[in-house]
Curated annotation (Swiss-Prot):
GO terms for biological process: intracellular signal transduction; positive regulation of TORC1 signaling. This is Protein Mo25. Gene3D superfamilies: Leucine-rich Repeat Variant. It holds the Pfam family Mo25. GO terms for cellular component: cytoplasm; nucleus. One of its GO terms (molecular function) is protein serine/threonine kinase activator activity. InterPro entries: ARM-like, ARM-type_fold, Mo25. Belongs to the Mo25 family. It comes from the Eukaryota.
Length: 339
């Protein structure tokens, strides 16, 4: 009895057939419709081989192993991603399902697909370029695959330390809301998933990240961008792994001035997120003189402002405790003794 049944192709045959169909689709000759149909059929067959189907047994481990190996040997993962814009709507979803399935595959403690992608970083860079304006129809599928990749520290490290990462500052501000939001989800995942890796990255790239790029997001004309960026900034500064970065950020007078201005924004949501960053400046027991001087100059105004700040949040115990603490700290501020 044939191992894969008469009508079912083996992993080797499936991968070969899909690669030929993708190449035909890429060539764009007169047989495009046929190539599109072949790509779709083969993607469904590979998806079913990985996930099983309603009328078939779950796939055996050795079948999945053979299929994965063929995907590596044929360089098909990169080829699929490079041609994602040419594949039909359902096919794009199947590519993401196939990619994420083989990515999660483990042999003991090893993740063979992660190891493979480490040797082919172009896969990651091509996925990141999925947020570019040229092909908006692939952005969300690219994002799904990128966030799955970001779960693995080795892959997140390649992405963070690439020039391509800094393009996210542009992607999160694109005019299409769904794409900008998806890009921000991936951006946030890369900056928060692996704490030590992220802390080292932010520390090593502090000026480029905060002064050259992040400041622009905080001053964006787009409300959603400003709010999301402000919220993420609060999370980054309050994460204990980012202590060095936080200390540096709250020592810079321009950052304090920006947060004080954002406390007075029209949007209550932005005011609230700004409060969570502002409190870090005030709570710092070792305030540099320029920071202390700004707080002292505005001492009375700040006490009055905070006393009347979001008074309707009466049931938010943590917020009210923090607000009371800040008011007390600001009231008790004194100039540094003369040297």
């Amino acid at each position: 009895m044939p191992l894969f049944g008469k009508s079912q192709k083996s992993p080797v045959e499936l991968v070969k057939s899909l690669k030929e169909a993708i190449n035909a689709l890429e060539a764009g000759d007169r047989k495009v419709e046929k190539a599109q149909e072949d790509v779709s059929k083969n993607l469904v067959s590979i998806k079913n081989m990985l996930y099983g189907s309603s009328d078939a047994e779950p796939p055996a481990d050795y079948v999945v192993a053979q299929l994965s190996q063929e995907l590596y040997n044929s360089n098909l993962l990169l080829l699929l991603i490079q041609n994602l814009h040419r594949i039909d709507f359902e096919g794009k979803k199947h590519v993401a399902l196939i990619f994420n399935n083989v990515l999660r595959r483990q042999i003991g403690t090893r993740s063979p697909t992660v190891e493979y992608i480490c040797t082919k970083p172009e896969i990651l860079f091509t996925l990141m370029a999925g947020y570019e304006d040229a092909h908006p129809e692939i952005a969300l599928n690219s994002g799904t695959m990128l966030r799955e990749c970001a779960r693995y520290e080795a892959l997140a490290k390649i992405m963070l330390h690439s020039d391509e990462f800094f393009k996210f500052f542009r992607y999160v501000e694109v005019s299409t809301f769904d794409i900008a939001s998806d890009a921000f989800s991936t951006f946030k995942e890369l900056l928060t998933r692996h704490k030590l890796l992220c802390a080292e990255f932010l520390d090593a790239n502090y000026d480029k990240f905060f002064s050259q790029h992040y400041q622009r997001l905080l001053n964006s004309e787009n409300y959603v961008t400003r709010r999301q960026s402000l919220k993420l900034l609060g999370e980054l500064l309050l994460d204990r792994h980012n202590f060095t970065v936080m200390t540096r950020y709250i020592s810079e007078p321009e950052n304090l001035k920006l947060m004080m201005n954002m406390l007075k924004e029209k949007s209550r949501n932005i005011q609230f997120e700004a409060f969570h960053v502002f409190k870090v400046f005030v709570a710092n027991p070792n305030k540099p003189k320029p920071i202390l001087d700004i707080l002292l100059r505005n001492q009375t105004k700040l006490v009055d402002f905070l006393t009347n700040f979001h008074t309707d949040r009466s049931e938010d115990e943590q917020f009210n405790d923090e607000k009371a603490y800040l008011i007390k700290q600001i009231k008790e501020l004194k100039p540094l003794p003369e040297a």
